[in-house]
Amino acid sequence: MKTIDELLAEGVDGKRVFVRADLNVPLADGLITDDGRIRAVLPTVKALAEAGAKVVVASHLGRPKGAPDPAFSLLPAAERLGELLGAPVAFAQDTVGPAAHDAVNGLQPGQVAVIENLRFNAGETSKDDAERGAFADRLAALADIYVGDGFGAVHRKHASVYDLPARLPHYAGYLIATEVNVLKKLTEDVKRPYVVALGGAKVSDKLAVIDQLLGKADRLLIGGGMAYTFLKAKGYEVGISLLQEDQIPTVKEYMERAEKNGVELVLPVDVLVSTEFPDLKTKAPANPTTVAADAIPADQEGLDIGPETRKLYASKLADAATVFWNGPMGVFEHPDYAEGTKAVAQALVDSQAFTVVGGGDSAAAVRILGFDETAFGHISTGGGASLEYLEGKTLPGLAALED
C-alpha cells in the first residue's frame, strides 16, 4: 500500500488530488455535534495543500436515497473543515456536475474544495458494478491522483471507495495508514493479556467479531444492551431489557467455546434498571434502581452496568497489555446511565496497556463524557470498519489501495 509520504516525495504541485474522506458527522438541526471525523482527515488535507496540490475532498453523510436531500448536505462539514484549516474552502453544490467541475477548475495550487454528498448519486452505493463504475468514471474526471483517507467507509464496496482507486494512481492517507497499523497490533503479535470490552445495543452486530476473538483474546467483558442476551442465555430473567431471542443459541455456543478455549468471558453482576427508557432530550432524572444481574424485575429493563460490575470490569482491565473497546456499557447519553461507560473509559486511561477505542458510539462517548482523547492509545474513526477488520474480513477500500 503506497502512502501519502511517497506521493509527497514524488511531488503534487498543481495536481488535482481527490481525497476520499469520512466527513459523516452527526448533525442536530444542521449543526455538527461531534467534529472528530473532520479533525481526523486534517493532517492529510493540510499536507497536500501545503505541497501545492489542488485538493478535492469528497465524502458521504448519512443515508440519503441516491438523490439530493438538503438534510444530508455536506455544507456544514465543508464550513467546519475551512474553520479548522484556517483557510476558505470552496463548496460545490453537486458531486460530478457543472458545480463540481467549476469548483475544481477554480482551484489554485494549495486550495481546497469539497464536493457535495457522494450518496446524492445512486451510483455511489449501487450493487450494480457497471452503474458504480460509471459514477467512478465521472469522479475520476475531477482528479489526477486518488488518496483514500475515509477509514470509516473502507468496509463499503462503494464507487468512491472501491472503484475509483482503480482509475487513478492511488495512495493511503495518514489516517488510513495509522488505522491499519493500529489494527495490526490487535491481530498480529498481540501483547498479552489482551482484553476486549464490547458493548452497544445489538449482540447480532458483534457476533462475528466475538467469534474471531474467542481464538485471540484472553478476556472478554460484555456490557450494553447486548449483555441481556448473554444473561438470558445463562438462564437469568431479564425483564423488558433489550433481548435478541434468536441469538441465544449462538451466544450459548460462544459461552461454551470461551470456557473450552480458556477465554475468560465476564458478564455484568449487577445492573441499573427502570420501568422506562430515559428522556434523552430533557435529561429528566430517571431514578434507576440497582439490582443483581439475576434479579431483574419482570417490568423493568437494564440500562447500564451497576456499581459492582464497574469495579469488576476496572479490575479485569487493570493488568491488560492490550485493550480494544467497542460499544458503550449503557445509555451513556443520559447522566443517570453514563457511569458504566465512564468507568470503562477511565480504566483504559488508568491502564499501562496499548488502548484502542473502536470508533462509533464509544469514540463519541469518550468525547461527550469529557475525556482527554490523547489519554488513549488510539481512537478509531471507523466502528464498523474496525470490527470487520478484526473479524478477518477483506475490506474493499483497503484492498483497492493495495494494488
From Swiss-Prot:
<feature type="binding site">
    <location>
        <begin position="60"/>
        <end position="63"/>
    </location>
    <ligand>
        <name>substrate</name>
    </ligand>
</feature>
<keyword id="KW-0547">Nucleotide-binding</keyword>
<keyword id="KW-0963">Cytoplasm</keyword>
<dbReference type="InterPro" id="IPR036043">
    <property type="entry name" value="Phosphoglycerate_kinase_sf"/>
</dbReference>
<dbReference type="GO" id="GO:0005524">
    <property type="term" value="F:ATP binding"/>
</dbReference>
<feature type="binding site">
    <location>
        <position position="206"/>
    </location>
    <ligand>
        <name>ATP</name>
    </ligand>
</feature>
<feature type="binding site">
    <location>
        <position position="333"/>
    </location>
    <ligand>
        <name>ATP</name>
    </ligand>
</feature>
<dbReference type="GO" id="GO:0005829">
    <property type="term" value="C:cytosol"/>
</dbReference>
<keyword id="KW-0324">Glycolysis</keyword>
<feature type="binding site">
    <location>
        <position position="156"/>
    </location>
    <ligand>
        <name>substrate</name>
    </ligand>
</feature>
<feature type="binding site">
    <location>
        <begin position="359"/>
        <end position="362"/>
    </location>
    <ligand>
        <name>ATP</name>
    </ligand>
</feature>
<feature type="binding site">
    <location>
        <position position="37"/>
    </location>
    <ligand>
        <name>substrate</name>
    </ligand>
</feature>
<dbReference type="InterPro" id="IPR001576">
    <property type="entry name" value="Phosphoglycerate_kinase"/>
</dbReference>
<feature type="binding site">
    <location>
        <position position="302"/>
    </location>
    <ligand>
        <name>ATP</name>
    </ligand>
</feature>
<keyword id="KW-0418">Kinase</keyword>
<keyword id="KW-0808">Transferase</keyword>
<dbReference type="GO" id="GO:0006094">
    <property type="term" value="P:gluconeogenesis"/>
</dbReference>
<comment type="subunit">
    <text>Monomer.</text>
</comment>
<feature type="binding site">
    <location>
        <begin position="22"/>
        <end position="24"/>
    </location>
    <ligand>
        <name>substrate</name>
    </ligand>
</feature>
<comment type="similarity">
    <text>Belongs to the phosphoglycerate kinase family.</text>
</comment>
<dbReference type="GO" id="GO:0006096">
    <property type="term" value="P:glycolytic process"/>
</dbReference>
<dbReference type="GO" id="GO:0043531">
    <property type="term" value="F:ADP binding"/>
</dbReference>
<dbReference type="Pfam" id="PF00162">
    <property type="entry name" value="PGK"/>
</dbReference>
<keyword id="KW-0067">ATP-binding</keyword>
<comment type="pathway">
    <text>Carbohydrate degradation; glycolysis; pyruvate from D-glyceraldehyde 3-phosphate: step 2/5.</text>
</comment>
<protein>
    <recommendedName>
        <fullName>Phosphoglycerate kinase</fullName>
        <ecNumber>2.7.2.3</ecNumber>
    </recommendedName>
</protein>
<dbReference type="InterPro" id="IPR015824">
    <property type="entry name" value="Phosphoglycerate_kinase_N"/>
</dbReference>
<feature type="binding site">
    <location>
        <position position="119"/>
    </location>
    <ligand>
        <name>substrate</name>
    </ligand>
</feature>
<dbReference type="GO" id="GO:0004618">
    <property type="term" value="F:phosphoglycerate kinase activity"/>
</dbReference>
<dbReference type="InterPro" id="IPR015911">
    <property type="entry name" value="Phosphoglycerate_kinase_CS"/>
</dbReference>
